[in-house]
Regions:
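Structured surface patches comprising rigid loops and adjacent beta-strands/short helices at the edges
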Residues: 37-46, 67-77
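Short structural boundary motif marking the start of a folded domain
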Residues: 21-24, 51, 81-83, 622
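N-terminal secretory signal peptides that target proteins for export/translocation
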Residues: 1-2
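A composition-driven surface/loop motif
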Residues: 77-701
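Sec/Tat signal peptide C-region and signal peptidase I cleavage site
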Residues: 15-21
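Short N-terminal segments immediately surrounding and downstream of signal-peptide cleavage
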Residues: 22-37, 41
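Surface-exposed, interaction-prone regions used to assemble/regulate multi-protein complexes
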Residues: 24-28, 46-48, 52-66, 76
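Sec-dependent N-terminal signal peptides
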Residues: 5-14
Length: 701
């Protein structure tokens, strides 16, 4: 009777002060209170036997009845727009304002289950500490789960388990830090959802996945804001199935046994925010998807010591249209079943495209790869900086033959197309390559800079070279800039197995690595450094080419060299046994300065364009100038290295029958300047070396 009196007192209190309150709170014995709008309530009555409390609604809208024994108390208070769950160790206090609108909340100790058939979006606010608790939500409509400084750990299950086909929003309440830890026998994730997840708010979430993933979702994951720290995870940090989208916020992932971000069979889209990822487990990835992977913005920092690891991995196409990416990799190649598996910055089974943004990576692992794609690689903008310094090695391939692996900055099984952007490559590993294409390479713009020091290595009695650009088919440049230095033994600048065509642009390559001999099945051979070389034709139609080799010929072809335009300065070694150019067929136009080497191979038959050969020593750094007989300037160039045998000069300003002068030293001003070559300027000073008349299209002085 005492309890009944308390209930009646509460009802009388309701009658007297209802005008000051908004909600009737019906507190049940399990610490769950249901809220009822006062304005919708006509009156509260007791059954005749006192066993039932009836809350009668206005306008005959119905009655909510409770067993008298189930009610702890009835209070009046303000309305609230959220279901609140406040954990307290193994207990929880719950206020449910939607208990009469399709939201049912039950609990067993600190394990809370929510079943919702509400048609409107419901908000759930979680706070307090649950020593061995969980939140399970079954909902048919979208909802928001607000973590307000909550700390939930569970020894055998997910901390948060969501069963819903609708969008579930997890809000990290501003200024708060929440912590979630699951057990080692739980579900797929410390947070697990069958439907899509969206993270909002500006709070912080620390999460540990002891069973499998830290966050697992069978649909999409979107990060709109907030900070998520994956403290550790047995498998992936964040695992989605249909898509992963990051628009803002920060995600930090470390100490994981799987991938940091795994989009599974879906897509990945990064528009903004910050990703700080560590890839420590072998053959795992920083950002992984089977479908398209796109970076439009944001800051991405990846540390990858894992052997066979991939910073970015997609079985489809990858695009970088913005953002800043920094990767530090040290993982090594691993040979499995006679096939090497590489540690790569980017690995795309499809194509790789970059239009903007920044990608900077340093890779010190053995045979480390920078950007690697099975399909075409297209770069039209942005800034790429890649450094590979890991060593090379050999293995037995699937056919039983000895094969090799080495580092590469950018490589593809198809074609490379560069039309813009800036690419800076530092290549230190032996056999390593800057750009490597199993197809063709097309340069129509952009800027490429390389610093190479890797040496050649002999594999199966054949040398494999450290090369700036290697094309297994054709190489064509029509615009853009390529500037490189190579100090490695047997180093190469640009090498094409097919036709090498220069239609424009600027090429400036210097090689200084020494030559070395090697023993093959057919005898002894020598690998030497070269600047520009091709197995097919080497065709120069336009542009500027400066090729300087301290130990070998500067430009060469195993088929033919055809020069019809542009400006070319080829300066090779002084050893008369080796030409500074190899395989020359014709010089029909343009400006061609052929310095040092076995120049007697250049004949009048080859030169239909007017050419003069000056066969006297020229010291390194000497300015060489040709003027007409009235000292009107035609061309000057500065010798990039010593020219003991002089040089030959082809220039459209030289005409058969004309009289000219050749000077060494002096100075030139004005005119058109490209690197160390000046045309149509003003010349003064210098020493007159020769006065001559061109009696034919080829004249030796």
């Amino acid at each position: 009777m005492k309890k009944k009196s308390l209930i009646i007192a509460s009802l009388l209190s309701f009658i007297s002060i209802a005008w000051a309150a908004e909600t009737i709170w019906i507190h049940q014995l399990d610490n769950i209170a249901l809220g009822l709008d006062i304005k919708s309530t006509e009156n509260i009555t007791l059954s005749n036997d006192g066993s039932t409390v009836n809350f009668n609604l206005k306008d005959n809208a119905g009655t909510h009845s409770f067993n008298y024994s189930e009610i702890q108390k009835v209070t009046l208070g303000k309305s609230q727009n959220a279901v609140t769950i406040a954990f307290n160790g193994t207990d929880a206090e719950i206020l449910n304002p939607y208990g009469f609108d399709g939201v049912t909340v039950t609990r067993s100790n600190s394990n809370v289950t929510i079943n919702s058939t509400a048609t409107e979006e419901v908000r759930y606010e979680i706070s307090g500490t649950a020593a061995n608790g969980s939140i399970t939500i079954n909902s048919s409509s979208p909802f928001t789960l607000a973590l307000n400084g909550a700390s939930i750990s569970n020894s055998s299950f997910s901390a948060i388990n969501i069963n819903s086909s609708a969008l579930s929003t997890i809000e990290l309440v501003n200024g708060t830090t929440s912590t979630l830890v699951d057990g080692d026998e739980g579900a797929n994730g410390c947070i697990f959802s069958t439907g899509s997840l969206k993270f909002t708010g500006n709070g912080t979430l620390n999460i540990t996945g002891n069973t499998k993933h830290a966050i697992a979702c069978e649909q999409a994951i979107e990060i709109a804001s907030g900070t998520i720290n994956v403290v550790s995870s047995l498998s992936d940090g964040l695992h989605s199935t249909t898509s992963f989208v990051m628009n803002d916020g920060t995600v930090n992932v470390k100490s994981i046994g799987g991938d940091a971000i795994d989009g599974d069979t879906g897509t990945i889209l990064i528009n903004g925010g910050t990703l700080n990822l560590e890839v420590t487990a072998a053959d795992k990835k920083g950002v992984k998807s089977d479908d398209k992977l796109t970076v439009n913005g944001g800051e991405i920092n990846i540390t990858m010591p894992a052997d066979q690891g991939k910073a970015f991995r997609t079985k489809a196409n990858m695009e970088i249209n913005g953002g800043n990416i920094i990767v530090n990799a040290s993982g090594n190649v691993v040979v499995t079943a006679n096939d090497p598996s590489y540690c790569s910055i980017v690995k795309a089974t499809g194509t790789f495209t970059m239009t903007n943004g920044t990608l900077k990576a340093v890779h010190t692992g053995t045979a480390g790869k920078g950007i690697s794609a099975d399909g075409n690689i297209s770069i039209s903008g942005g800034n790429i900086s890649l450094e590979v310094s890991g060593g090379n090695g050999t293995y037995t391939n699937t056919t039983g033959d000895l094969d090799s692996y080495s580092a590469t900055c950018i490589s593809t099984d198809a074609n490379i197309n560069i039309s813009g952007g800036t690419i800076v490559m530092i290549v230190k590993g032996n056999q390593a390559k800057g750009l490597k294409s199993n197809g063709s390479v097309y340069i129509t713009g952009g800027n490429i800079a390389g610093t190479l020091s890797g040496n050649a290595a002999v594999i199966n009695d054949n040398p494999s070279y450290c090369t700036l650009i290697k094309s297994d088919m054709d190489f064509t440049i029509s615009d853009g800039t390529i500037i490189a230095t190579h100090t490695g033994v047997g180093g190469k600048g640009i090498s094409a197995d097919g036709t090498l065509t220069i239609n424009g642009g600027i090429i400036d390559i210097t090689t200084s690595g020494k030559s070395e001999t090697y023993t093959s099945l057919t005898g002894t051979g020598t690998y030497k450094s070269t600047c520009v070389t091709s197995d097919g034709k080497l065709i120069i139609k336009n542009g500027y080419v400066k090729a300087v080799s301290a130990t070998n010929y500067a430009i060469g072809s195993n088929t033919s060299i055809e020069i019809s335009g542009g400006i070319t300065l080829a300066c090779g070694i002084a050893d008369s046994s080796t030409s500074d150019l190899s395989g020359i067929t014709s010089v029909s136009g343009g400006t061609f300065i052929n310095a040092s080497g076995n120049m007697h191979n250049l004949t009048a038959t080859q030169c239909s364009a007017t050419t003069v050969k000056y066969a006297s020593n020229i010291s390194a750094g000497t300015l060489v100038t040709i003027t007409d007989s009235s000292d009107n300037h035609i061309i000057s160039f500065k010798a990039p290295q010593a020219m003991p045998q002089g040089c030959s000069i082809t220039h459209p300003g030289l005409k058969t029958g004309g009289s000219y002068k050749l000077y060494t030293g002096g100075s030139v001003s004005g005119g058109t300047v490209i690197d160390s070559i000046t045309q149509a300027g003003t010349f003064s000073g210098g020493d007159l070396a020769k006065s001559f008349k061109l009696s034919s299209n080829f004249t030796s002085l």
